[in-house]
Structures are given as structure tokens and as C-alpha cells.
Amino acid sequence: MQRQEIEETSGKYLEFMVHGFMNGLITLQELEGISDEEMETVYALGYNFFTYGKYEAAKDIFTGLTAYAPYTSHYWRALGAVNQQLKDYTEAIAAYDMAVANDENDVVSYVYRGESQILSGNVDPGLNDLKKVLELAPAHPEAGQWVQRAELLLKLQESKKPA
């Protein structure tokens, strides 16, 4: 009798978990029981590939991470950075969109999305992202280098305008 109860309880738990996943209530990471620490270890591997110019390998890792933890902003930012390095600006922008959707104060993603927008010919949306960085700056003093980068890019774009 006890074995049957265990099987019924396990079945109900599995059904609950799958239902939660299918309805977006839990992530694949949670469904699989992968810890945040394990995810960050995989992220570090992807980051190392990225640092050494192994962009396709890094892209595979970051794509997997975003599938397993779609609400983790820095995984999306990393995927955006890889796509930006590969000059796939459409995919980079989409990944940065997800990063910003998950963290509306992600100054770094705004800078990189702005760059990608400008590089893909969407200058006005790119400038808007860079201006957003300046709006967020007072609340994020730790983002000084990104604010400086946004200011520099805005000045460069301003200097390209006809007089």
C-alpha cells in the first residue's frame, strides 16, 4: 500500500511541476532541479569562451542558459553580446530586449542595445537607449563606465549630424 501511495504522490507532483512549466509558472531550471550555483558555473564557462573569441560555443551556452532561466537578465545580456560580436544585430537587439524586460535598470544592456541599434541603422532607437542610460545614471553610481560610454556614443552621433 505504501508503494502505491508514493507512486500516486510522485505522479501528482510530476503533473503539478509539468503543469507549472507549461503555464510559465516555473522555469526549466526549476523543473530540472538545477541550482543557481550550477547555472553560474555554466555561465562562467560561456564567459570564458566569449573572452577567448569562441563566439559560437559561447552562443550555444548562453542560448541554453536563457532557455533554462528566461528571467535572468545577465544571461540574455551575454547572449546579446555574443550576437553583437557576430554582427547579428537583429538577434543581439532581441536578446538585449529580453535583458531589459527582466531588469529595466540594466544599464549595460541599454548601452549595448543602443550600440547594436545604431550599427544596424536604427539610429533613433539607439540614441533613445543611450539617453535612457543617462536617465538611469543618478540611481546607479556603480555604472560610471557605462554612462561614460553612452555619453561618448551620443557625442559621436551628434558630431555626424550635418551642420
Tell me what each language-model feature is.
Residues I118-P141, Q148-K155:
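TPR/TPR-like (Sel1-like) alpha-helical repeat modules
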Residues M1-E37:
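Long, contiguous interaction/recruitment modules in multidomain scaffold/adaptor proteins
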Residues D36-D103:
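Alpha-helical adaptor scaffolds
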Residues G11, L31, E37-Y47, P138, ...:
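Alpha-solenoid helical repeat scaffolds
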Residues A78, Y112, W146-R149, L153:
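Canonical tetratricopeptide repeat
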Residues T51, Q85, L119, L153-L156, ...:
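Register position in tetratricopeptide repeats
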